[in-house]
Amino acid sequence: VEEQEATGIVVGVDGSPLSVEALRWAARLESGVGGPITAATAWQFPVMGLGMYRDKQWGPEDDARELLNQAIGDAYGGSPPRGLTTLIASGPAARVLIENSRGARLLVVGSRGLGGFARLMLGSVSAVCAEHAACPVLVVHAPTVKPAAGQAEDADAPARSWLA
């Protein structure tokens, strides 16, 4: 997987289960939207305690790359979509995604990331992206209703809520 600028579908990835699901949704939508999928993640240096990171082998960019590769593996196993690229950028996640939405046809994000406010229906990054992105935004939610015993799970539920 090579790194390059975003074009077709940009997917915000933070390692959360919903960002992995966002990667899966992007693969489902790729042929209809057109263009390749770019899995994008953002990193920042910690604000406090920079002195404790004196090990020159460690860096937040390396952690971001590892997180992104793990999420891609979780989403696609050993068969990522053809043409999948990655984008690892320094800065706040919302800013990175909004900047890269300018060259995209669709931005896909999970409704909740790894932030600390679990009671919110929409996370701060997904809310800011939905408001400011330069392209349409698909916010992927977790299924809210579990299928009854013996019934198949409705894989199109997030798409229906997006299209409604």
Language-model region placement:
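Small/aliphatic-rich secondary-structure junction motif
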Residues: 2-53, 100, 132, 143-145, ...
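Structural motif
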Residues: 8, 105-106
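A short acidic, glycine-rich active-site loop
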Residues: 56-67
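Active-site phosphate/pyrophosphate- and oxyanion-stabilizing loops and adjacent acidic/basic residues
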Residues: 73, 95, 127
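Short helix-capping segments at alpha-helix termini
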Residues: 75-81
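A non-catalytic structural micro-motif
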Residues: 83-87
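Charged docking surfaces used in two-component/phosphorelay signaling
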Residues: 88-95
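Glycine-rich, Arg-bearing micro-motifs that act as flexible, cationic patches
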Residues: 106-132, 146-149
